[in-house]
């Protein structure tokens, strides 16, 4: 009798669990179901605070890394759903309440508006005349310019896109549920970094850029070419016609073969010159629109796509070829770094806080870089001459960057407290940084003191000399010059270098560094930004505030686990008010407290940056251009002589430019006047939480409870004063909200009036 061997089944790695967590609305309806203590319900009013503090702190729900990973993954889909709903709302406003088509016909004469206020009790005053007979609120998001660059020519297309956004949101909500409750990935899937890198680089960034490049070439470029030539939007063929009908493209770009297969042959045979009509290397700005050449940006996205698709094939997965991240990290040893990056692979695959800290620091820095590039090289048509939008985009990306960087430090400190394992990090870079943290922090402290006294001292000197009537003894372009020679050298270098490094480019990347004035519709789009003593001085204020922010945040991370004062700090957790009773002088030392203090300095820092930008641009860049080429700036170049004293900043910037928001009542800008007042109030309200003692409120509450008891209306849930940390959290939140909204109202009322 012969026994046949069992059929060999191909081995398949199972990377999901089926139906791991039941879908229970009954469970979700119970507040605090994720925490045993909270689930019992409220005994005191502290319960509602803890409910909010812990709802998304998945580390406290379970210690199982796989379950935590799944919750984070699922939450990402929920976040994306919210983003799609929000974007859909933006597009819907563009479709239903905007003057987009009128703006498209006359982008220099008509202002963008996508919101019309209902006149319930006289709010109709807010609907200002934005041109072309349309009355609404002027928007400063830059969406109109983005839509034009995308090739959107009518409001129906916006409507369709808005519906598409809702469909995507629904898909994301489904995915978030499906990947937690039905098919949940195993931990090894989350830790498979090579596969993740390949997919994110080649798929998300590579194919994403390729898809956008394809859209730009086949839809954006032909439509924008026709718009620039003065063809009415309603006479331009619809996007799909350019894709399906090659003869339309052949009319606009005759020297290219637009055949379905023959069109891509030059790409793979390296005959790239065939595409030079629409994949250009012009450099500089399009003189018609004041934006980057869309043919340059299409070229850029195609190049980026090629690079990232290659990058997405570099990491070792199923075929045993390519890089292994663990090997790269463990081989990375410098002459002074001991065991180098050994152990970091384990850190970054088991601590999502460590991963998030790096990502937040990188994304925050990137957002700040985006802010700088948006005005120097405006990417969309007619963006550069829309001054309110330019100011808003700069301010927005600076604030976002600041918050993300602080978030990076916050999660760095949480990683140190919750996830750091000293035994796994022996003499590697992380361990060595922690061992010489005193040297790092004391040096940083010295730098902060030096920068603070010297930068502020220059201003104090100038205020004093001006008060004494001795202008020749002031630091200024006409007195004692402190020219930013290195910055001027960099500007000059960047103006000249492309001639050698990019000989085929027609112009340098940005005229901010040097070149001719680019004017659109009689307004300055961009021109060389001349730097002088005033810029040198405020630059050192920037250096000072950045270094203080870094000092606070880095100290919080490096001393999160222990310090000479509290050697066992790691046992107290990420946030604790004091190590007491019985140990004086140990308050405000937790990782959380450093984030709290860091937020205030981040706010200081970004405020000075956006004030500098706003005034510098109004003084030296933005303005009107006469037919003979003379430029009249909004504030007539007063930055160089006024921004060199503290009094100048107070009088000629804050006070002089606040006149529009203060005098906005009775005009379409009156909402900004109300916001200006209201946000000051919110800011002042924050001080009540920041300068208060917990015991004071607890005593007050107890006497109020006594009165309620007398009247037999005592509450079942015992009222409690906010804890020290809750009070600080409420305080810093209102401080930032009030400060940012005040700045927003101040900036917009000003720039909409004069821009």
UniProtKB/Swiss-Prot annotation:
Record: residues binding chlorophyll a: 688, 696
Keywords in alphabetical order: 4Fe-4S, Chlorophyll, Chromophore, Electron transport, Iron, Iron-sulfur, Magnesium, Membrane, Metal-binding, Oxidoreductase, Photosynthesis, Photosystem I, Thylakoid, Transmembrane, Transmembrane helix, Transport
Superkingdom field: Bacteria
Subcellular location: Cellular thylakoid membrane
Membrane-protein topology: Multi-pass membrane protein
A GO term for molecular function: electron transfer activity
Location, primary (coarse class): membrane
A GO CC annotation given for this chain: plasma membrane-derived thylakoid membrane
Record-linked SUPFAM superfamilies: Photosystem I subunits PsaA/PsaB (SSF81558)
Residues annotated for phylloquinone binding in this entry: 697
GO biological process, one term: photosynthesis
Transmembrane segments: 65-96, 156-179, 193-217, 294-311, 353-376, 387-418, 437-468, 533-558, 591-619, 669-690, 724-753
InterPro entries with a match to the protein in the record: PSI_PsaA, PSI_PsaA/B, PSI_PsaA/B_CS, PSI_PsaA/B_sf
The keyword Signal belongs to this UniProt entry's keyword annotation: no
Catalysed reaction, written as an equation: reduced [plastocyanin] + hnu + oxidized [2Fe-2S]-[ferredoxin] = oxidized [plastocyanin] + reduced [2Fe-2S]-[ferredoxin]
This enzyme's EC code(s): 1.97.1.12
Co-factor: note: PSI electron transfer chain: 5 chlorophyll a, 1 chlorophyll a', 2 phylloquinones and 3 4Fe-4S clusters. PSI core antenna: 90 chlorophyll a, 22 carotenoids, 3 phospholipids and 1 galactolipid. P700 is a chlorophyll a/chlorophyll a' dimer, A0 is one or more chlorophyll a, A1 is one or both phylloquinones and FX is a shared 4Fe-4S iron-sulfur center.
Binding-site positions, chlorophyll a': 680
Cited Gene3D superfamilies: Photosystem I PsaA/PsaB
Cytoplasmic side: 1-64, 180-192, 312-352, 419-436, 559-590, 691-723
Stretches assigned to the Lumenal, thylakoid side: 97-155, 218-293, 377-386, 469-532, 620-668
NCBIfam families per record: psaA
PANTHER family recorded: OUTER MEMBRANE PROTEIN, OMPA-RELATED, PHOTOSYSTEM I P700 CHLOROPHYLL A APOPROTEIN A1-RELATED
Quaternary structure and interacting proteins, as annotated: The PsaA/B heterodimer binds the P700 chlorophyll special pair and subsequent electron acceptors. PSI consists of a core antenna complex that captures photons, and an electron transfer chain that converts photonic excitation into a charge separation. The cyanobacterial PSI reaction center is composed of one copy each of PsaA,B,C,D,E,F,I,J,K,L,M and X, and forms trimeric complexes.
Protein family according to the UniProt entry: Belongs to the PsaA/PsaB family.
Name used for this protein in its record: Photosystem I P700 chlorophyll a apoprotein A1
């Amino acid at each position: 009798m012969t026994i046949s061997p069992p059929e060999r089944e191909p081995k398949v790695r199972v990377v999901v669990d089926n139906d791991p967590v039941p879908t229970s609305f009954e469970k979700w309806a119970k507040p605090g179901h994720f925490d045993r203590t909270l689930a019992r319900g409220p005994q005191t009013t502290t319960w509602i605070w803890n409910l909010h503090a812990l709802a998304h702190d998945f580390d406290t729900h379970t210690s199982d890394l796989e379950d935590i990973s799944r919750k984070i993954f699922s939450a990402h889909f929920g976040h994306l759903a919210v983003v799609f709903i929000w974007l859909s709302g933006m597009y819907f406003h563009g479709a239903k309440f905007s003057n987009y088509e009128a703006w498209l016909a006359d982008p220099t004469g008509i202002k963008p508006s996508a919101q019309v206020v209902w006149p319930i009790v006289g709010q109709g005053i807010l609907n200002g005349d934005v041109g072309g007979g349309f009355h609404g609120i002027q928007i400063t998001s830059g969406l109109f310019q983005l839509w034009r660059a995308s090739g959107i020519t009518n409001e129906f297309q916006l409507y369709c896109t808005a519906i598409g956004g809702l469909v995507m949101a629904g898909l994301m909500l489904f995915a978030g549920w499906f990947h937690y409750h039905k098919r949940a990935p195993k931990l090894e899937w989350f830790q498979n970094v090579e596969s993740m890198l390949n997919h994110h680089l080649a798929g998300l960034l590579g194919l994403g850029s390729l898809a956008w490049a394809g859209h730009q070439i086949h839809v954006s470029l032909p439509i924008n070419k026709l718009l620039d030539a003065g063809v009415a939007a309603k006479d331009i063929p619809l996007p799909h016609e350019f894709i399906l009908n090659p003869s339309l493209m052949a009319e606009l770009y005759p020297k290219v073969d637009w055949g379905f297969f023959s069109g891509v042959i030059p790409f793979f045979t390296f005959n790239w010159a065939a595409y030079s009509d629409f994949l250009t290397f012009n450099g500089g700005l399009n003189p018609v629109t004041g934006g980057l050449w869309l043919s340059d940006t299409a070229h850029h996205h195609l190049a980026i796509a090629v690079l990232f698709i290659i990058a997405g094939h570099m990491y070792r997965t199923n075929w045993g070829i390519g890089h292994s991240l663990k090997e790269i990290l463990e081989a990375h040893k410098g002459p002074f770094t001991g065991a180098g990056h050994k152990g970091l692979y384990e850190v970054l695959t088991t601590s999502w806080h460590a991963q998030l800290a790096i990502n937040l620091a990188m994304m925050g820095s990137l957002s700040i870089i985006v802010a700088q590039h948006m005005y120097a090289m405006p990417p969309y048509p007619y963006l550069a001459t829309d001054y309110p939008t330019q100011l808003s985009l700069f301010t927005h990306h600076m604030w976002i960057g600041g918050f993300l960087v602080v978030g990076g430090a916050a999660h760095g400190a949480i990683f140190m407290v919750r996830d750091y394992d000293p035994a796994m990090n022996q003499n590697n870079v992380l361990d060595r940084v922690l061992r010489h943290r005193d040297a790092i922090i004391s040096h940083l402290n010295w730098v902060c003191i030096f920068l603070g006294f010297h930068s502020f001292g220059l201003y104090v000197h100038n205020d004093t000399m001006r008060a004494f009537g001795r202008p020749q003894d002031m630091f200024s372009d006409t007195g004692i010059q402190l020219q930013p020679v290195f910055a001027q050298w960099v500007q000059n270098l960047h103006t000249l270098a492309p001639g050698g490094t990019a000989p085929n480019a027609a112009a340098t990347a940005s005229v901010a560094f040097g070149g001719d004035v680019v004017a659109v519709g009689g307004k300055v789009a961009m021109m060389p930004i001349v730097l002088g003593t005033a810029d040198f001085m405020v630059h050192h204020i920037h250096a000072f505030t950045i270094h203080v922010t870094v000092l606070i945040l880095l100290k919080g991370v490096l001393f999160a686990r222990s310090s000479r004062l509290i050697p066992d700090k790691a046992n107290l957790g990420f946030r604790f008010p004091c190590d007491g009773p019985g140990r004086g002088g140990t308050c405000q030392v937790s990782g959380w407290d450093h984030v709290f203090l860091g937020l205030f300095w981040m706010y200081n820092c970004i405020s000075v940056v956006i004030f500098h930008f706003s005034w510098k641009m109004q003084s030296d860049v933005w303005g009107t251009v006469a037919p003979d080429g003379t430029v009249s700036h909004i504030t007539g170049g007063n930055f160089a002589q006024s921004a060199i004293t503290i009094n100048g900043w107070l009088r000629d910037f804050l006070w002089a430019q606040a006149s529009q928001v203060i005098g906005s009542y009775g005009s379409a800008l009156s909402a900004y006047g109300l916001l200006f007042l209201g946000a000051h109030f919110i800011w002042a309200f924050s001080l009540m939480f920041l300068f208060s003692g917990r015991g004071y409120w607890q005593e007050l509450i107890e006497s109020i409870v006594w009165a309620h008891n007398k009247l037999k209306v005592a509450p079942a849930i015992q009222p409690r004063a906010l804890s020290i940390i809750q009070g600080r959290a409420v305080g810093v939140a209102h401080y930032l909200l009030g400060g940012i909204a005040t700045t927003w109202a101040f900036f917009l009322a000003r720039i909409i009036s004069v821009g």
